[in-house]
């Protein structure tokens, strides 16, 4: 490969962005032999009794939840419930809920700070959100209103509790639902204390407590003061964390119920009053509150989040999928017996060619409908349900173990680079660059576009030459290692593919704690 002149490309700062933070999506629980013996004994004796009694109490909650809303019309439920229903049912649910968590082993809830009134802070924001036990924070908050998925209404008992709570419901299948939720949050938050407080988990999903995920702006759209609420589980062994990669629901429940005693600390921080700029910009407001809470917790505030169904971590100035869908696509196609000989068929460099699912199956010679649908769904579709065959060619080329990294990056450039209006050379513009990074690294398009603009700023054009792109993807001190990790996906027969968090013989580099590191060699 021609390296070009030294002035063609300048590497980015080798230490870009904030210091590396822990990976919040992976929770590893290491038990000693003595701890395993203890959990086996207590898990056989204590856990079944606790879980059984807790489920009995859960079903005892249903009559109180039903009684509070029985006979009320939809119009009446649009206003806060008062009178005897509020007094009897609210106190009944509050007492039984505390008993439920007590039976599961949460013998102590230690409260620090002072909860603000609904006039002082109409909205409460709780973090870190690390487990399905986190609703315990509702108890010292006097059962505030919550935001939940509309689909949960059909879950026995849980649906009744959501109606009792007069929860704000959002539907994943209704595009207009989010707008209505925003309007309802604003209506309640600006009611002058008429409505009880609304509690949000602004991270939106669970992590391992080692870092705060990016806060979603929903809790901050109304622009009213919020009170941050910190949740800590100061136990010697972290059995409660329920992260994307780690112990599942049943194991977390069993391990926690097997503990003799679990403690929860709930701390109310001072009310955060937004500035005029924050009131107008919910994202700025959310980011600033996140930093305040992270500082109080002593953990990093990160940009990590879920994009779709994939966890995304931050490496330098780029967001990448913790485990790219490309690896999952490889497993699907290997099971179907796809040969690498079909990699480049039909792809025209620099020109998009949209294909249907049927043509996709013909090109790859796939016959099983389930395999075809799963593989086709990996690629981004247009409004007509078609995909660009260049995307297919690049993804399959990346899964072909016989290609070098230089060949892969050259192919990526050739497929997506465009002719210049003036000049003989072809350049890789932001759309092609973001498509490549989305396919190979799982990077969201906005993050890739921002990085492209930064790379082009070091040069004199709006696009990248082949030399510049390969210097970035192969030789940059940070991103070069990232490409070498993700373009050498692990080939394993295990049920789950290996995440890039641990070094392996098949991985020249690995992601550790959110940063790219080279594996140690023998004798180091």
Curated annotation (Swiss-Prot):
SMART domains, A to Z: PlsC
EC top class named in words: transferase
Molecular function as annotated in GO: 1-acylglycerol-3-phosphate O-acyltransferase activity; 1-acylglycerophosphocholine O-acyltransferase activity; 1-acylglycerophosphoethanolamine O-acyltransferase activity; 1-acylglycerophosphoserine O-acyltransferase activity; 1-alkenylglycerophosphoethanolamine O-acyltransferase activity; 1-alkylglycerophosphocholine O-acetyltransferase activity; 2-acylglycerol-3-phosphate O-acyltransferase activity; lysophosphatidic acid acyltransferase activity
EC code(s) of this entry: 2.3.1.23, 2.3.1.n6, 2.3.1.121, 2.3.1.67
Membrane disposition: Multi-pass membrane protein
Catalytic activity from the UniProt record: a 1-acyl-sn-glycero-3-phosphoethanolamine + an acyl-CoA = a 1,2-diacyl-sn-glycero-3-phosphoethanolamine + CoA; a 1-O-(1Z-alkenyl)-sn-glycero-3-phosphoethanolamine + an acyl-CoA = a 1-O-(1Z-alkenyl)-2-acyl-sn-glycero-3-phosphoethanolamine + CoA; a 1-acyl-sn-glycero-3-phosphocholine + an acyl-CoA = a 1,2-diacyl-sn-glycero-3-phosphocholine + CoA; a 1-O-alkyl-sn-glycero-3-phosphocholine + acetyl-CoA = a 1-O-alkyl-2-acetyl-sn-glycero-3-phosphocholine + CoA
Transmembrane segments: 40-62, 87-107
The protein's name in its UniProt record: Lysophospholipid acyltransferase LPCAT4
PANTHER family the record matches: LYSOPHOSPHOLIPID ACYLTRANSFERASE LPCAT4 (PTHR23063:SF7), PHOSPHOLIPID ACYLTRANSFERASE (PTHR23063)
Gene (UniProt): LPCAT4
Keywords, sorted A to Z: Acyltransferase, Endoplasmic reticulum, Glycoprotein, Lipid biosynthesis, Lipid metabolism, Membrane, Phospholipid biosynthesis, Phospholipid metabolism, Transferase, Transmembrane, Transmembrane helix
Motif HXXXXD motif mapped to chain: 129-134
Places the protein is found: Endoplasmic reticulum membrane
Residue ranges, annotated region (Disordered): 489-524
């Amino acid at each position: 490969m021609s390296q070009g002149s030294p002035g063609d490309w300048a590497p980015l700062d080798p230490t870009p962005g904030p210091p590396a933070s822990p990976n919040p999506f992976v929770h590893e629980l290491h038990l000693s032999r003595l701890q395993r013996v203890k959990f086996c004994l207590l898990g056989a004796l204590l856990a079944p009794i606790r879980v059984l009694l807790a489920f009995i109490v859960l079903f005892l909650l249903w009559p109180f939840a039903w009684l509070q809303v029985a006979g009320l019309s939809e119009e009446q439920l649009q206003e806060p419930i008062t009178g005897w229903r509020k007094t009897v049912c609210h106190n009944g649910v509050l007492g039984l809920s505390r008993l439920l968590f007590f039976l599961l082993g949460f013998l102590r809830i230690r409260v620090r700070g002072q909860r603000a009134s609904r006039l002082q802070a109409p909205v409460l924001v709780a973090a870190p959100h690390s487990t399905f036990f986190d609703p315990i924070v509702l108890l010292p908050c006097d059962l505030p209103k919550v935001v939940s998925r509309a689909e949960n209404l059909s879950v026995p008992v849980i649906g009744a509790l959501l109606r009792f709570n007069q929860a704000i419901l959002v539907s994943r299948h209704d595009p207009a639902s989010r707008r209505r939720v925003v309007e309802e949050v604003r209506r309640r938050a600006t009611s002058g204390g008429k409505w009880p407080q609304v509690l949000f988990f602004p991270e939106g999903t669970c992590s391992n407590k080692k870092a705060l995920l990016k806060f979603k702006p929903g809790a901050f759209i109304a622009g009213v003061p919020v009170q941050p609420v910190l949740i800590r589980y100061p136990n010697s062994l972290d059995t409660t964390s329920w992260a994307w990669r780690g112990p599942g629901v049943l194991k977390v429940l069993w391990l926690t119920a097997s503990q003799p005693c679990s403690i929860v600390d709930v701390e109310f921080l001072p009310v955060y009053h937004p500035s005029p700029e924050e009131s107008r910009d919910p994202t700025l407001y959310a980011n600033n509150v996140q930093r305040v809470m992270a500082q109080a917790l002593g953990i990093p505030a990160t940009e990590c989040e879920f994009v779709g169904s994939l966890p995304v971590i931050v490496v330098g100035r780029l967001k990448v999928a913790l485990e790219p869908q490309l690896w999952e696509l490889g497993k699907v196609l290997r099971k179907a017996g796809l040969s690498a000989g079909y990699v480049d068929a039909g792809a025209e460099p620099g020109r998009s060619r949209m294909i249907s699912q049927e043509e996709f199956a013909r090109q790859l010679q796939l016959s099983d409908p389930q395999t075809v649908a799963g593989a086709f769904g990996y690629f981004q579709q247009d409004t007509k349900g078609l995909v660009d065959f260049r995307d297919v060619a690049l993804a399959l080329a990346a899964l072909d173990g016989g290609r070098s990294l230089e060949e892969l990056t050259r192919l990526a450039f050739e497929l997506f680079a465009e002719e210049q209006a003036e000049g003989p050379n072809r350049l890789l513009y932001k759309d092609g660059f973001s498509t490549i990074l989305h396919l190979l690294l799982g990077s969201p398009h906005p993050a890739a576009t921002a990085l492209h603009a930064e790379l082009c700023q070091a040069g004199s054009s709006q696009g990248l030459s082949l030399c510049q792109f390969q210097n970035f993807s192969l030789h940059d001190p940070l991103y070069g290692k990232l490409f070498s990790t993700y373009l050498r996906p692990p080939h394993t027969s295990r049920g789950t593919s290996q995440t890039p968090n641990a070094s392996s013989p098949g991985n020249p580099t690995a992601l550790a704690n959110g940063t790219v590191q080279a594996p140690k060699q023998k004798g180091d």
